[in-house]
């Protein structure tokens, strides 16, 4: 599946409607620069700033993740969110993990990593996928680790009321190239098929005996 860039880190600055990033000037844009050399330097500075922000966010992620001694550590999942409304963006920690996995796999210097990004080289994924937030009301049921079908509860009680469970699911796209098999496979010699794969996440569920509890359930996570 294609990797998405994590959003920039927002910081407070003076001025109306201003959104700034560490080390980046908040006034002017690339169109107002004096010449092509300045534009090139501006783009390079922006790329360096982006990578610097990502590294800061990754460091913060390690700090906020629950430790092994925490009794609630097994409830941690990047694809599950408790919220009063539908999340507008993919989960930040999920994006950071994908970016970190890419950097670890690349095992290259920062500048080489940036220029080797598949998105920069115009590469395409083998299978096209789509990702979206799904509510428990839409899922209704799921399969747990024991193979039993359980009911996914729509709301989770919290001290100040209730929050809805949302799941960030990724599955193969029903449109386009996926119907013709995997991209890049020679169809003269090989048959291929894009399939949605699943992973386990922790969710509040109820079994057929009306017992409510946190269980690992399967959701669509990749193509």
Swiss-Prot record:
Main localization, broad class: secreted
Listed Pfam families: NGF (PF00243)
Glycan attachment residues as annotated in the record: 107
Superkingdom per UniProt: Eukaryota
Gene Ontology CC terms: axon; dendrite; extracellular space; synaptic vesicle
Subcellular location: Secreted
InterPro entries assigned to the protein according to its UniProt record, in alphabetical order: Brain-der_neurotrophic_factor, Cystine-knot_cytokine, Nerve_growth_factor-like, Nerve_growth_factor-rel, Nerve_growth_factor_CS
Propeptide: 6-114
Keywords: Cleavage on pair of basic residues, Disulfide bond, Glycoprotein, Growth factor, Secreted, Signal
SS bond list: 127-194, 172-223
One of the record's GO molecular function terms: nerve growth factor receptor binding
Residues of the signal peptide: 1-5
SMART domains for this protein: NGF
GO terms under biological process: cell surface receptor protein tyrosine kinase signaling pathway; modulation of chemical synaptic transmission; negative regulation of neuron apoptotic process; nerve development; nerve growth factor signaling pathway; neuron projection morphogenesis
Reported function: Promotes the survival of neuronal populations that are all located either in the central nervous system or directly connected to it.
Family: Belongs to the NGF-beta family.
Protein name: Neurotrophic factor BDNF precursor form
Organism: Eryx jayakari
Gene name of this polypeptide: BDNF
């Amino acid at each position: 599946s294609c990797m998405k860039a994590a959003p920039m880190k927002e910081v407070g600055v003076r001025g109306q409607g201003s959104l700034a990033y560490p080390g980046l000037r908040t006034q002017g844009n690339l169109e107002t620069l004096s010449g092509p050399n300045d534009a090139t330097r501006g783009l390079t500075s922006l790329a360096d700033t982006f990578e610097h922000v990502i590294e800061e966010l990754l460091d913060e992620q390690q700090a906020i993740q629950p430790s092994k001694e925490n009794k609630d550590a097994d409830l941690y999942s990047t694809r599950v969110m408790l919220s009063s409304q539908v999340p507008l963006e993919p989960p930040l920690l999920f994006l950071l993990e994908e970016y970190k996995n890419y950097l670890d796999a690349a095992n290259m210097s920062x500048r080489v990593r940036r220029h080797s990004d598949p998105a920069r080289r115009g590469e395409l994924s083998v299978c096209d996928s789509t990702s979206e937030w799904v509510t428990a009301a839409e899922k209704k049921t799921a399969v747990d680790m024991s193979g039993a079908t359980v009911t996914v509860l729509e709301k989770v009680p919290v001290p100040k009321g209730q929050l809805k469970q949302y799941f960030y699911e990724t599955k193969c796209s029903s449109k386009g190239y996926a119907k013709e098999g995997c991209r890049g496979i020679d169809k003269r010699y090989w048959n291929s098929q894009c399939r949605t794969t699943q992973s386990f996440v922790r969710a509040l569920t109820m079994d057929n005996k009306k017992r409510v509890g946190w269980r690992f359930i399967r959701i669509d996570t990749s193509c």
